[in-house]
Amino acid sequence: MSYYAFEGLIPIVHPTAFVHPSAVLIGDVIVGAGVYIGPLASLRGDYGRLIVQAGANIQDGCIMHGYCDTDTIVGENGHIGHGAILHGCVIGRDALVGMNSVIMDGAVIGEESIVAAMSFVKAGFSGEKRQLLIGTPARAVRSVSDDELHWKRLNTKEYQDLVGRCHASLHETQPLRQMEENRPRLQGTTDVTPKR
């Protein structure tokens, strides 16, 4: 893992969290219990404090950064999709930020909300509970349905289960030269296949 002290501040990572070895955590970063931090994630606590609360996940290639005297927060059971950028914002409890979305300074995403993939949330946006936000700039189009929230929670549970799976079996290795006979397929712990 790449952990760096900065001006006397050392990242804090709960022992039950999983941080991928290629992720980088710098300075004032606090990672809670059962959190998943994916490959190539960058959490730069060299200006403001970054807080990832219990059960949240920060997926591959995500960036978290902030500015002085502020906290950038991902709330409990927050779900941050691949490639998302969070800058000086607050993501509410049980909210989802879709892949490659950008959430700007001072924005607040309400709890149980969903930000659609590729959305841009402007600085200072103040969201309410359980909103579906879509677009560039993002706007609330309706409330998140019970089915959508259930789907989000199943996906978050997959990442919470992945923490233990990674602790138990993830290790660096050399690649095989060919596919072995009867190669098994990996299985998740819940069925999160998108409905068409």
Swiss-Prot record:
For this UniProt record, the keywords arranged alphabetically read as follows: Repeat, Transferase
Renumbered to this chain, region (Disordered) spans 173-196
Compositional bias segments (type: Polar residues):
187-196
By its UniProt entry, which Pfam families does this protein fall under? Hexapep
Entry's Gene Ontology BP terms: carnitine metabolic process
A single MF term (Gene Ontology): transferase activity
Q: In which pathway does it act?
A: Amine and polyamine metabolism; carnitine metabolism
Name the PANTHER family for this protein. DYNACTIN SUBUNIT P25, GAMMA CARBONIC ANHYDRASE-LIKE 1, MITOCHONDRIAL-RELATED
What is the annotated role of this protein in its UniProt record?
Answer: Overproduction of CaiE stimulates the activity of CaiB and CaiD.
Q: What is stated as this protein's family in its record?
A: Belongs to the transferase hexapeptide repeat family.
Q: Which HAMAP family match?
A: CaiE
Query: Per its record, how is this protein called by name?
Result: Carnitine operon protein CaiE
Say which species the protein is native to.
Escherichia coli (strain ATCC 8739 / DSM 1576 / NBRC 3972 / NCIMB 8545 / WDCM 00012 / Crooks)
